[in-house]
Amino acid sequence: MKILHISNFGDKHNGRLYWNQCYKISNGFIRNGHNVYNFSERDKSRSDLLNKFNNNKKLQSSILESVKIYHPDVVLLGHADRIHHETLEQIRSINPNIKIAEWNVDNYMLDNTEHKLKTRSKFLDGIFSTTADNKLSECLSGNFITFFPNIVDPTIEKQKIYNNT
């Protein structure tokens, strides 16, 4: 399966965020035999100064161009807050069979998470969240929402602190 993983990969930080969930998720897909293209939407947004003034127009076209070139089976979003809902609709018009899902590791009550999930839900096939709360089901819009645990990747978490307890 080909997966276009759109998230904040933090390229501007020169490896400082190597432990982020987005890398662990991509690593897991690759280890399970999938082809993953990591698209760092915040870095791409910042790379064109005009994006700041034109509502990320260049970012939206770059995402659509990536979908046309890469032909993913799945678009997976993770904290990809700069993607417009219209862009998600256009992705479906390019490939009506594509699956679009979002993962979330933020507390439901913090950082506008509830609003983000509720407004984006109708454009998604599903949502994966590390926080389980009955309020999360209010985000459903004809799709599914499910719990997934915080991810541990043995290639990243090497300290094994749990052995010290």
Feature-to-residue mapping (PLM):
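Extended catalytic core of nucleotide-activated donor transferases of GT-like folds
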Residues: 5, 9, 15-141, 154-158
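Nucleotide-sugar donor-binding and catalytic loop/hinge architecture
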Residues: 1, 158-165
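Short, flexible helix-coil linker/hinge segments at the edges of structured domains or between repeats
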Residues: 145-161
